[in-house]
């Protein structure tokens, strides 16, 4: 994916860049695979904010993605188009199965229009093919990996993400995650060969607040500039430092949010490396 940088004709364009969409072969999505997508504005069913800084943005329609591919084993499919999906960072590929059905999948790097792919234990080790982990050779780069057999892919689904299959131990496969964490997964789980495409998406600079509003992101306001009624750090005469250790608007102390005794921790062989550049 090529990235286009604008000339600095305005302050907003000076720092902005956009994708050239060179891999996209069709601009209109498949109508039968679209679903309505209503916005929540970051609120739950009670109207309470559960995710801050969300709201507005361009109207979208959800593209139904096949994250399982287990009911099409042995059926060949031809890549009809590579399309843009506003709901995710990765591009999507429209498959025309030889039995007449159409489905979307995540577009791996190197998958082009006209390529024939398949799924199942007997499929070749080829970019875009979907197989159980027990049938994939050690050292293969994979993505779209399941955590539970038949539950659909949960791991390595964003643009440029990939997982390496390090080995197989009994009924488990050992995987190196994008975070460098090494964990075990049931060997019956399925994965797709290759890495997710559109890897340069991370290099796009949005340039101005307006483009983030188009994407549905609202401003982030510091607690120290709020009133005391709105944030524990708010208030004070003049410019203050907050007067206490950093907390959330609800008084929750800043720090790690992951559960220390999560049930899936037993599958972790080695923790991910700490970010050395993180300020402490």
Curated annotation (Swiss-Prot):
One of its GO terms (cellular component) is large ribosomal subunit. Residues 253-269 have a biased composition (Basic and acidic residues). One of its GO terms (biological process) is cytoplasmic translation. Transmembrane segments: none annotated. Keywords: Ribonucleoprotein, Ribosomal protein, RNA-binding, rRNA-binding. Residues 29-58, 225-280 are annotated as: Disordered. The keyword Repeat does not apply. InterPro entries: NA-bd_OB-fold, Rib_uL2_dom2, Ribosomal_uL2, Ribosomal_uL2_bac/org-type, Ribosomal_uL2_C, Ribosomal_uL2_CS, Ribosomal_uL2_dom3, Ribosomal_uL2_RNA-bd_dom. Residues 45-58, 270-280 have a biased composition (Basic residues). SUPFAM superfamilies: Nucleic acid-binding proteins (SSF50249), Translation proteins SH3-like domain (SSF50104). GO terms for molecular function: rRNA binding; structural constituent of ribosome; transferase activity. Signal peptide: none annotated. It holds the Pfam family Ribosomal_L2. One of the primary rRNA binding proteins. Required for association of the 30S and 50S subunits to form the 70S ribosome, for tRNA binding and peptide bond formation. It has been suggested to have peptidyltransferase activity; this is somewhat controversial. Makes several contacts with the 16S rRNA in the 70S ribosome. Part of the 50S ribosomal subunit. Forms a bridge to the 30S subunit in the 70S ribosome. Belongs to the universal ribosomal protein uL2 family. This is Large ribosomal subunit protein uL2.
